[in-house]
Amino acid sequence: MELPVCFYEERLRQQETEIKSLAAEIERLKNCGFVSETPSLEGLREENAKLKYRLNILRKSLLEEKKKSSKSMININAQIQEIFGTAIGAAYPELQNAPLAVTPSQQPKFGDYQCNSAMAITQMLKAMNQKVSPREIADKIVKNIPTNELVEKVDIAGPGFINVHLHKDFTSKQISKLLVNGVQPPVIWERKKVVVDFSSPNIAKEMHVGHLRSTVIGDSICRLFEFVGHDVLRLNHLGDWGTQFGMLIAHLQDKFPDYLTVSPPIGDLQSFYKESKKRFDEDEEFKKRAYQCVVQLQNKTPNFIQAWNLICDVSRKEFQKIYDCLDISIIDRGESFYQDRMIGVVKEFEEKGLVQVDEGRKVVFPPGCSVPLTIVKSDGGFTYDTSDLAALKQRLQEEKADMIIYVIDSGQAIHMQNVFSAGRMIGWYDPKVTRIEHAGFGVVLGEDKKKFKTRSGDTVRLIDLLDEGLKRSMEKLKDKGRDKVLTAEELLAAQTSVAFGCIKYADLSHNRMNDYIFSFDKMLDDRGNTAAYLLYAYTRIRSIARLANISDEDLHKAAKETEIILEHEKEWKLSKCILRFPEILQKILDDLLLHTLCDYLYELATTFTEFYDNCYCVEKDRQTGQIVKVNMSRLLLCDATAAVMAKGFDILGIKPVQKM
């Protein structure tokens, strides 16, 4: 939850007070020159230097925070909550943790925001044997609202709903600030180290449609946390270790005996994997050799490590093709990275008396978990449980993570909760201090509402899905005649923007907790809540000023000089929608549900359409088509809308184009 602005301002005030105090202390120390012959003089000089150093640091910090605060977008909802929190505290000081319920109003007649706390406070007072109606409570809250620049007026409706009407002057100035400074993130109280574990395919297997969700959702979460200013580590927890590498190395030795000196031409690693698996299942001698290869690999025998690296490199190159298509940045850190750390993890659990032996296995029962974690198999080998525990410990203790987010399918929910619980039990982290969360997601379904498969029943390869998206998006653009008006370069840019944008948006626009139906026809439809509709809307908005011969430089200059007029109801509605962007982002930072951003962008686009249909931005002579009037205030509202949409697209990993 973002801290209210009052806390931030109080922090600045405290810093300013401390600066004055430190300055006075330095002055006092300067006046102590007469004690030069005493032994304490050197100590006083040292203290003086420390105070000066601290003073300079504080001044620099203060200037940076003021500069950042002045440019940042304001979370209006949070500020209204702060105002009403103050009012409720003044009206009912005896209440601890009084409920704060502030939401945007659904209808203009109920103002711009509503505070619905009175009903809940009635119940709290009733429990204290005080019988007061919600309307009386609302009235008392209203009388205690502090002076502020946001709220123009309030009125009480129904049983005790408080309708909040914003100052148009305040809203106008916030739009101007956005236009001058660009779309800036809301101020965060503390920059944190955030580790996001996502994508995570297995070496020697192709990425399939199931990897799409983790990859797209994880990337978008990273983009959001990066935008607001956190230090994000994007990790690809590759499946690059295990017994399957024994059969792959044995097959490599047979098929490419000179692999140590000549790079083997493994064109299709999936087929290579299937061939080795077939031999492993059918040939006992091959199976024995495969197990021997596993032992050699675990002992880190150089030739076997080289073979393992060759196989991993082939896979990584194939994965990178997909990451390049989807514009995904990620650091590979597979299970192999944690192998040497697993021994220490097992030892730590044993030393703390947390290990039980079950049929030769070493298991751990985390609190509240009925299924144990197996940290050592009966044959002495480690498991995925051991690997995940080692990864958790490394991220907490070596990476110093303040937050770890695992973007893994919901089928792993019990396993992830067991791992987290074990981490708490052994004392690696305190959930009150460190946020560790499983951002689970449902499966991708075909239009038959069954798991998405090819006609032959195979899992859909992700690269094939992306290629099909490119093909269909080009067909869609040609159906609209865009190949006749766009240059070859513009057409190619539009094709990739629509193809990959639609695939990502179709996923992100659904609540990640639910399964979703994959349909190219629906995602490429330019009507409704789709990327196609939003991308077309964006290019249309961007073209308004261009067709009026107004350059970006003209708009930027006008933003500093032009007052934003919000007299028409559609101007007012659009401005409020634009300024809700920070509160939308804050909600997603809290719950990691990205469909909220998609819903907001769709609402913004449809609200803009209402505005554009009712408010002339550029007036032309009906006979000649010549421009007779440009409403710069409205053009700036267009520009602000496009700027917020562009930043929303960026967080979703979608690349809009200027022409489509």
UniProtKB/Swiss-Prot annotation:
Gene: rars1
Alphabetical keyword list: Aminoacyl-tRNA synthetase, ATP-binding, Cytoplasm, Ligase, Nucleotide-binding, Protein biosynthesis
Residue ranges annotated as motif 'HIGH' region: 201-212
EC number(s) from the headed UniProt entry: 6.1.1.19
Source organism of the structure: Xenopus tropicalis (Western clawed frog)
Protein name, per record: Arginine--tRNA ligase, cytoplasmic
Reactions catalysed according to its record: tRNA(Arg) + L-arginine + ATP = L-arginyl-tRNA(Arg) + AMP + diphosphate
GO cellular component annotations of the record: aminoacyl-tRNA synthetase multienzyme complex; cytosol
Subunit structure: Monomer; also part of a multisubunit complex that groups tRNA ligases for Arg, Asp, Glu, Gln, Ile, Leu, Lys, Met and Pro.
Stretches for region Interaction with tRNA: 529-543
Family: Belongs to the class-I aminoacyl-tRNA synthetase family.
Subcellular localization, as worded in the UniProt entry: Cytoplasm; Cytoplasm, Cytosol
Keyword set includes Nucleus: no
A GO term, aspect molecular function: ATP binding
